[in-house]
Amino acid sequence: MAYSIPTPSQLVYFTENYADYIPFVNRLINARSNSFQTQSGRDELREILIKSQVSVVSPISRFPAEPAYYIYLRDPSISTVYTALLQSTDTRNRVIEVENSTNVTTAEQLNAVRRTDDASTAIHNNLEQLLSLLTNGTGVFNRTSFESASGLTWLVTTTPRTA
């Protein structure tokens, strides 16, 4: 048994572009209470997001049966917000950019605080947008909706009977 031979545009469905719906949404909900003022806080969220990405289907492994629900992270609406969320956590070496690191000016310190606040605000905004999309079912697949949206057909092979 296998999926029909995919076209190149269907190969993306076999990659680590999924997240298990309930654990992922729970992680997003829990993350909303963080301030993300430290790089370690932003790194922790980024790591949680990246470790949530899984592959649930392959050419020879069918999408899990109901009641399994997975978020397709390459869905155009989800991907835009998810990518923005990942980018907003990546502020390492950009929070403090100074000419002379041994003599940081007050203006440079204030700029670093603003960048940290901007990153934290962006993370919170992206978390809320992503939760809103997921609550509305955007990019959420079960087996039936996955096979319909992807155009992949599960082929059941039968073995010929011998007399």
Swiss-Prot record:
GO terms for molecular function: structural molecule activity. InterPro entries: TMV-like_coat, TMV-like_coat_sf. Keywords: Acetylation, Capsid protein, Helical capsid protein, Virion. Disulfide bonds: none annotated. Pfam families: TMV_coat. It is found in: Virion. The modification N-acetylalanine is found at residue 2. Coiled coil: none annotated. It comes from the Viruses. Gene3D superfamilies: Tobacco mosaic virus-like, coat protein. One of its GO terms (cellular component) is helical viral capsid. Belongs to the virgaviridae capsid protein family. Capsid protein self-assembles to form rod-shaped virions about 18 nm in diameter with a central canal enclosing the viral genomic RNA. This is Capsid protein. It comes from Sunn-hemp mosaic virus (SHMV). The lineage of its organism: Viruses, Riboviria, Orthornavirae, Kitrinoviricota, Alsuviricetes.
